[in-house]
C-alpha cells in the first residue's frame, strides 16, 4: 500500500497538463464571476489560472480534495489504475451505507458552504475550483443548506461544472 499512498501524494502535488484546456463556456463563466475561489492544491491553483488568467483568486484549504480511504480488503499488488477503481468502489460502498465521509470532512464541507455563502453575498456569482470526491460532499451540503442544484456538465471529468443557485 505504500506505493498507493505515494501515488496519492504525487497526484496531490501535481499541477495540470499543458494541453488541458477548459471549455469556452467555463472560461466565460469564470471571467464574468464576481469571485473565484480555489483549493490550495497545485492542480486547483493551476486550473483557476487556466480558467481566468490573471484574475485574483481567493485560496482556501476548505476546498481541498477529500482523501479517500485505501481499502484494506485489497491485499495483492495491483497496477495503480486497479487501485484507483478499488478506492472509488470502496468510497461508493461506504456512501451507500450512509458513511460518505468522516465527521471532520462533513464539518469541512459545512464550513466551505459558509465560505461560499459569504462570497456569493459579497460578489454575486462565485466559481469554486475544487476536486471530485470533495465536490460530491460539498454538493450535498449546499443542497442541505438550501441551494438548488442545476444541471451538471461533465460529471466528474476534468473541467466539469456543477452549478448551484439560491
Question: Which positions does each model-derived feature cover?
Answer:
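Short, active-site-adjacent cap segments at secondary-structure transitions
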Residues: 44-45, 134-136
Amino acid at each position: 500500500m505504500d506505493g498507493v499512498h505515494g501515488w496519492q501524494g504525487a497526484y496531490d502535488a501535481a499541477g495540470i497538463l499543458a494541453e488541458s484546456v477548459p471549455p469556452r463556456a467555463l472560461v466565460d463563466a469564470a471571467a464574468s464571476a464576481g469571485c473565484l475561489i480555489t483549493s490550495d492544491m497545485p492542480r486547483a491553483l493551476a486550473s483557476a489560472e487556466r480558467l481566468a488568467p490573471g484574475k485574483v483568486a481567493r485560496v482556501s484549504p476548505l476546498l481541498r480534495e477529500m482523501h479517500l480511504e485505501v481499502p484494506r480488503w485489497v491485499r495483492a499488488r495491483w497496477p495503480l489504475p486497479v487501485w484507483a477503481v478499488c478506492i472509488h468502489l470502496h468510497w461508493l460502498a461506504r456512501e451507500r451505507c450512509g458513511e460518505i465521509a468522516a465527521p471532520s470532512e462533513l464539518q469541512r464541507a459545512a464550513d466551505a458552504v459558509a465560505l461560499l455563502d459569504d462570497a456569493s453575498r459579497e460578489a454575486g456569482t462565485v466559481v469554486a475550483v475544487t476536486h471530485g470526491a470533495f465536490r460530491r460532499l460539498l454538493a450535498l451540503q449546499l443542497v442541505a443548506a438550501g441551494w438548488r442544484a442545476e444541471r451538471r456538465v461533465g460529471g466528474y471529468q476534468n473541467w466539469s461544472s456543477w452549478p448551484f443557485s439560491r
